Amino acid sequence: HIAYTAVAGTLTVGSSDAQDAQLGLDGKPEPGSELALSEPKEPKDAPATARMFYVAYFKKDAKAEERPITFFYNGGPGSSTVWLHMGSLGPKHVMTGSDQHLPAAPYKLVDNAYSLLDVSDLVFIDMPGTGFGRIMGKDAEKSFWGVDEDANAFARFIARFITKYSRWNSPKYIFGESYGTTRSAVLANVLENDHSVDINGVILLSQIFNFTTDIDAPRENPGVDLPYELALPTYAATAWYHKKLPQQPTALEPFLKEVEDFSMGPYAHALALGTDVSDTEKQQVAQKLHDYIGLPVDYLLKANLRVSGGQFEKTLQDDQDLTTGRLDTRFSGPSLNPLSETAEYDPQSSAISSAYVSLFNDYVRKDLKYGEGQTYLPEALFGTFQWDLVHHGNPIDLNVANDLANAMKTNPKLKVMVNGGYYDLATPFYAAEYEEKHLPISAALAKNIQFSWYESGHMVYVRDESLKQLHDRVAAFIHDTQADSK
């Protein structure tokens, strides 16, 4: 057992660098600053600020310059970090068991045998407008709810945090999940180039950089067939898990390699031909797809060889009237509407959400003594929530690959670790590999990227065996990157 101190609190950040520089660590304008002198009478007319909530865990009696610190955040966009905090590498862990829906409360919170505190201090940060954090002032939502605005807020938060706790000279890591990986690509670049904070390692979990690879809505973008090719190995893993294949291979990983080769070869070729594909080739590819993902040949031909995530989730276990999960395809639940073409809800989200939110609310008040009389928002209030996907002034589909590439070029020692689940259809693992292997960097720099896959879903840590692997592999990554930087 590792002795640690837990601190829950908030730090206030500004919505521009100029304004942020004039805010003290208490979040108030520094006396005599331009900001203090021009303070409006009404708080709603003041420049926007975000009070960001965090929980930090520090190992007792550790030397700051020798002790790594890792900043964690979930995605959404619009999500608090309750999921990573209560499920992954923090000192406490929500017991969720297997791939089944949990019964209602009481739920069980236990000490986490796989906490990362053995190698790093941990900071779990809630994005602006979630958790116990609040955004306020003029145009507050526009000032924080967007790709660039959000990354800037996190960079300002981290700069303030390492000032408050004297951690400028500690090895630093950022750990984002899902949209949090999108944030990390932008954030690593902003920290390095705007705040002079070099990061030792970027740890990505369930990555999405390029939003045109999304398998949820590929039909909106005809002619872009990449999403189908990158999701195919996840379809195959899912069919394998649910034993829906005509011939069931014994081992998963060699089977997935075979599917990847097919996906980038004969499958990609047939899709690229569009309406020029011959009947013979189409029939052959449909037959092979049937062998790999278990859906009927006639269904695959009707779908023109292109099956969206929602269609796959609805169709794979249709004979049992079950809908397959999206975030974790090992989960299944009763279909809401048997005649629906696509899945109408996600069995995994509905299976575990209540346990996480209930236990966090209990833990933060009883153990951390924080939040009395306040409401904890697991997500931004979605009635008013709108996210601005414009990045660097570019309104077309979001792709943050250039940001990470730039961070790696300007800090060639930066190491990147990509983690993902074979059973994740929200951000398929093969898409993450494809994105990383297409970063505009040299082959030498690409050696700084490593991949780690797990027999789990989007939140790989809900499966105990995967959580243990995640801990061991992330711990090894932190050790190795420190050895490299000495």
Provide a role label for each language-model segment.
Residues 425-448:
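Active-site-adjacent alpha-helix of alpha/beta-hydrolase-fold enzymes
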Residues 90-97, 188-293:
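A catalytic-pocket lid/entrance helix-loop region that shapes and gates access to the active site
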Residues 270-426:
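Alpha/beta-hydrolase fold catalytic core
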Residues 455-466:
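Catalytic histidine-centered segment of alpha/beta-hydrolase-like enzymes
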Residues 176-189:
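Glycine-rich nucleophile elbow surrounding the catalytic serine of serine-hydrolase chemistry
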Residues 167-179:
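Alpha/beta-hydrolase fold nucleophile elbow
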